[in-house]
Amino acid sequence: MLLYLHGKRNLIHRFVKSKPLTSMNKIIQKQQFSEKVFKFEIEAPLIAKSRKAGNFVIIRVDKNSERMPLTIADADTRRGTITLVVQEVGLSSRKLCRLSEGDYVEDVVGPLGSPTHIQNFGTVVCAGGGVGTAPLLPIIKALKKAGNRILSVIAGRNKDLIILEDEVREYSDEVIVMTDDGSYGEKGVVTIGIEKFINQEHIDKVVAIGPPIMMKFCCLLTGKYNIPTDVSLNTIMVDGTGMCGACRLTIGGKTKFVCIDGPEFDGALVDWDEMFKRMGTFKAAEREEMEHFEEHLCRPETAECNCGAKAQTHGADAPAAFTTETLEQLKDRDAEWRKELRKSMKPKERMAIERVEMPELSPEYRIAHRKEEVNQGITLEMAQREAKRCLDCAKPTCTEGCPVSIDIPSFIKNIERGNIQGAARVLKNTSSLPAVCGRVCPQEKQCESRCMHLKMNEPAVAIGYLERFAADYAQRCGEQTTEKPESNGMKVAVVGSGPSGLSFAGDMAKRGYEVHVFEALHEIGGVLKYGIPEFRLPNHIVDVEIENLRKLGAEFTTDCIIGKTVTIEQLKEEGFKGFFVGSGAGLPNFMNIPGENAINIMSSNEYLTRVNLMDAADPKTDTPMNFGKKVLVIGGGNTAMDSCRTAKRLGADVTIVYRRSEAEMPARLEEVRHAKEEGINFLNLHNPIEYIADENGAVCKAVLQVMELGEPDASGRRSPKPIEGKTLTVETDQVIVAVGVSPNPLVPKSIEGLELGRKDTIVVYDCMQ
C-alpha cells in the first residue's frame, strides 16, 4: 500500500516474493477468445492475495478513462496476478482491449463488493452466459471446494463465444453447453440447459451470471420451481466504494447499492425493468464518445494541469522580510512587538475600520468559467488593514470557536506587522490545511461567530479571509513553514485522504511519526477533490497542501482499501502501531420516495464526482454525463450550493428546492449569496414527494409538497410540516439529491472489530480505541 519504495516494496515482498514495484498493473498475458472478448492477466499482487469469489475490481485504463467495474475471474497468488475477461462494449472496455502484453493499466483497485456466500447447499446449478462464465468460474471452484455437486450450463450465441469450457469442466460434475445457433453443444438458450438439470434431479440452488436479460429469464424459470437463485449485477458505477449511489437498484422493494450490498442478490427480488432502464442512462453520451474513439487513441498528452497554475493576482505582493523568530516569539502576546501593536491604535479606532470585502469574479463571467475561483483573494494592503480590526483580546473567544484551536490573534497580529511568513507558521503549527480551511470552513458559524466585534453590533473580523491570505502567501513563496521533525520510528496508518485524514497525517508528522495515508480512490484529497468544485477550492491549492505533508515525511498510496486490499493485521506485521480511520461520511442519502431511481436522478456525490474528479464535462475525458437543461437540486446545504452552481456553469436553468425557509438553510451565507448572484432560483418551503418518469424511464416531472414551518427541532431550526392537500408539479430533466450523507459502510464492513454506534458511526472510547 505504501506508494513510495520503502513501504510498498516491503508489503509486496511479504505477500509476493521479489516482485518489483515497477511491475504494478502490468499486463502479463493477453489472450483473445473471440473477435471482441479478451482475457487479461494483470499484475496486482495484493488484490490476488485478498480477493474472494464474487469480488470485482475498478479499472481505469488511462488518465482520461472512466472507472470501470470488472469481476475477477481468477487469481494466482504465486504470480501475483488477477485474471479479467473483457468484452468490447463501450469506450473504456475497447481501450483496454487495445492494450498489449507489457502495457500498464493506470489504476486497479479492489477487491470490491461482498464476496459470494459459500456453503454446502447440496446440488447447485451454475449458469453462465457469454462473458458471464468468467465471473462464474471462481464461484464454481469455491462451491465445489465446499462440497457441493456442481451442474454447469455455459451458453453463447455460437461456438466462438463459448469461453473457459475446459476450466468449468474441471470443477463441475456435469456440464451442458448451449449455443443459440446449434454450432456447438446443444441448440438453444441457457434456460433450456437449466431446466434439463431441474428435470433430471433435485436442485438446491442456482447461480446465474450473464447479460441482464438472461439472468431475468433464469429467475423466471427457477421461480416456477421455487429454487433460490442468485445473480451478479454489473451496473453503472463511478467509484465502486459506496460513495456516489450510481449503482443503486431496487432489491426487494428497497434501494441497495450494488458496489457495497452486492454485486450478488436474490434474483427473485431484483426489479429487472428498473435495472434495464438504468443501464441505458448514458447510452447517448457513450455513443458520442465511441464516435470519437480514434481521436482518443491518437490524441497526444496535452491534458491541462492546474498544479503549476499561476497564482492569484490578488495578494501577490512583494514578500515581507523572512522571519527568524521562534514559534514561541511569534505567538507571545507579551512580546515587545505585540505590545507596540496594541499601543499603536486605540480599540475604538480599530472598531471603526470597515470589514474588508473579498474581490470576486463577476457573476456574468464566473458562470461561464467552471474552474476559475470566484473569490480572488485579498491584497497585502487589504489584509493588513483587516488585521488592524483585531483587538488582540487577552481571552480570545474566537479561538474557542475554532475546532482545532488555532491561535487566531497571533497569526492576525503577525499579518498586521507585515510578517506574513510568521503568520503562516502560526497557522501551520495547529492546522495542516490552512489554505483549504480559509476557503471552505464555515467561519461565520465557528471562529467569527465568537468575535468580540459582534457584541458591539459590528461585523466580525474576516478571520477566514486572513487565514487564506497567509496560507496562499506561504504557498507562493514556496517556503516550508513547518520543519520536518526527527523521526520517532513509529509507523501510523491513516485510512482515507480527505480533510480528516490529511489533518491527522499532518499532526502526526509534526510529532515525528512515520505517517502512511491510504486512499481508495485514484486521487489524494477525498471530498476536497471529488466534492468541492474548483470555483470554490482549486485543485492546485489542495495539491500544494498535500505536497507540504510529503515534505514532512507523509507517504500516500492510492487505489488501496484497508480491510480488503490489505488488512489491519497485515499492516501490524509491517510494524504499524496505530490506525486512524478517516473514511468520512461518504454514503449519500436518498429520500426513498416513489420514482427516485428514475434515470437522471442522482446524488450530489455522483454528480460532483463525475464533474470534479472525473472531469466529465471535458470532451477529452471518457466518463459519461447527461447534462440537464432544467435541473432541480434538492437540499439547502453547502453541497446543494456546489451542485446548483456547477449545473449553472454547465448551462442549466437551476432551481434549489428546500423544505424550510432560507433562514434555516445550513449552507454558508456566502454560498447562498453567490448562488443568487449567479441566477439560481430558490423554491423554499417545498419538498419532493414523487418523481414522474417518461416512457424511457427518465425523470420528467417532480411532485412537490408545499410546506410550512412549525416549532424548532433539536438543531434549533424550525421544523417543516406539510400543508395538507397542497402540492406543486414542476417539469425537470435532471434532479440532484443533496439531502445529506451517512458514514460509508465500506470500512466498517472490511475491518473486523469495529463497533458501530449512532447512525452507524464508528465508536471511539476515551482511551482512543
Residues covered by each model-derived region:
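FAD-site-proximal beta/loop scaffold in flavoenzymes
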Residues: 597-628, 712-769
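Feature captures the FAD/FMN-dependent oxidoreductase FAD-binding
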Residues: 486, 491-495, 543-593, 690-703, ...
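Rossmann-like dinucleotide-binding cores of NAD(P)H-dependent redox enzymes
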Residues: 157-166, 514-517, 521-552, 556, ...
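Ferredoxin-type iron-sulfur electron-transfer modules in oxidoreductases and energy-metabolism complexes
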Residues: 223-225, 367-386, 407-439, 457-484, ...
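Ferredoxin-reductase
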Residues: 20-101
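N-terminal Rossmann-like FAD-binding beta1-loop-alpha1 element of flavoenzymes
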Residues: 491-515, 640-648
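Local cysteine-cluster metal-coordination motifs and their immediate loop/turn environment
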Residues: 135, 212-213, 234-264, 295-311, ...
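FNR/FR-type flavoprotein reductase catalytic core
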Residues: 91-239
